[in-house]
Amino acid sequence: MSLFEQLGGQAAVQAVTAQFYANIQADATVATFFNGIDMPNQTNKTAAFLCAALGGPNAWTGRNLKEVHANMGVSNAQFTTVIGHLRSALTGAGVAAALVEQTVAVAETVRGDVVTV
C-alpha cells in the first residue's frame, strides 16, 4: 500500500497540506516566502505534488522545483523549519508517528532542489 493510500488518499493529503500552509503562514521566519502568493492555488499545487510523490495519482503539473526556488534564498535552516511544519500538520491530523517520518523522508528528497543558500 502506498504512502498516499496509508495517509487516507486525496482528501487527507489536501487537508494536511492546508494545515501545513497555515502553520507556515503563522511563522514569521518562513511566511515571507509566500507574500503575494495565491495560497489556495499554492495549496492545491503542493497537494498534487505530494500525492504524486507519495505514490498517488500524478496530477502535478508544476514547474521544476529547482527553477522555482532558484532565486528565493531558502536556507537549510528554513527548509528544516518548513519540514517541521509538515511534521506538525501530519501529527495534528492523527497520522501515526512511523508514517509521519516516512512522509517527511519523501519531502526531504527535494531539499537539494529548494535550498539555495
Curated annotation (Swiss-Prot):
Positions of post-translational N-acetylserine modification: 2
Positions of heme binding: 21, 69
Domain of life: Eukaryota
CDD domains per UniProt: TrHb1_N (cd00454)
UniProt cofactor(s): heme
Acetylation keyword on record: yes
MF terms (GO), sorted A to Z: heme binding; metal ion binding; oxygen binding; oxygen carrier activity
Record has Metal-binding as a keyword: yes
Signal peptide feature range: none
Annotated cofactor note: Binds 1 heme group per subunit.
PROSITE patterns named among the record's database cross-references: GLOBIN_FAM_2
Keywords: Acetylation, Heme, Iron, Metal-binding, Oxygen transport, Transport
Pfam families hit by this protein: Bac_globin (PF01152)
Family in the record: Belongs to the truncated hemoglobin family. Group I subfamily.
Subunit description: Monomer.
Name of the protein: Group 1 truncated hemoglobin trHbN
Organism of origin: Paramecium caudatum
